[in-house]
Design a protein with these regions (language model features):
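Active-site acidic/histidine proton-transfer and metal-coordination neighborhood
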Residues: 1-91, 103, 187, 202-204
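Histidine-acidic metal/acid-base catalytic patches
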Residues: 9, 73-91, 100-216
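Active-site-proximal loop/turn and secondary-structure-junction residues that shape catalytic pockets
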Residues: 23-27, 64-68, 96-98, 124-126, ...
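Generic enzyme active-site microenvironment
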Residues: 61-62, 93-96, 154
Length: 216
């Protein structure tokens, strides 16, 4: 709880607007208690964070992530239920990569979030840059427009590791990254990725822009 409050403080100092919150430990897929206990813990912790974020004018967006990264909040309807239990201004932050895994209909999930959607993370179904997989970006953006979403599309690609001769992007992995902290290295590894070369990262960023800019 204190860590997220510290993040809220940092975002405020950087003149940011919103903090996305995964209300569980990423990578932990075994429950700690009974469902009703864990729900109570989550609501209690989020309410404390929410009270602080409200006091400094920062929005919270509860983000559901896929079942292989957490057992707790995986779908948009779960995130909405938690947001409503926390407070009237608590929002949700959806992620196209996770939605592709967990939602029966990702477009309906977006529609259900109308009025509570405060952030949207974009990556393709393979977690590469938008346009490098099979997600329908034209329909995704159109659905966001339909519900009146006019906030940021946060590009959050996390390219999968491929250390085999079949790697379609040779020389994409940075074998000797400079200035990468142990925490950043662990974050990348926890997400099935690694440090990538500057050229590869630039290509992913360029592809994201080429895919999304014509739609917005």
């Amino acid at each position: 709880v204190q860590y997220v409050k510290d993040v809220v403080t940092m975002v405020k100092e950087l003149d940011g607007k919103m903090v996305s919150v995964v209300p569980a430990t990423v990578g932990k897929i075994i429950p700690d208690g009974r469902p009703e206990e864990e729900w109570e813990w989550a609501v209690e912790g989020m309410k404390e964070i929410y009270a602080y974020s409200e006091s400094v004018g920062i929005l919270l967006g509860i983000e559901p992530i896929n079942r292989f990264e957490t057992y707790f909040i995986n779908r948009g309807d779960q995130a909405l239920a938690l947001a409503k239990a926390v407070g009237p201004n608590c929002g949700v932050c959806l992620d196209s990569f996770h939605m592709n895994i967990e939602e029966d209909d990702m477009f309906e999930a977006i529609r259900r979030a109308k009025g509570r959607l405060v952030g949207f993370h974009v990556a393709d179904n393979n977690r590469m840059a938008p346009g490098m997989g099979r997600l329908d970006w034209k329909k995704i953006v159109a659905t966001l427009r339909e519900i009146g979403y006019n906030e940021v599309l946060s590009v959050e690609f996390c390219s999968p590791l491929d250390r085999t001769p079949a790697n379609p992007y040779p020389n994409s992995i940075e074998e000797n990254p400079q200035g990468l902290s142990p925490e950043a290295k662990k974050f990348l590894e926890d997400h099935g990725s690694s440090a990538v070369t500057e050229d590869f990262y630039s290509m992913l960023t360029r592809k994201s822009v080429e895919t999304l800019r014509p739609l917005i």
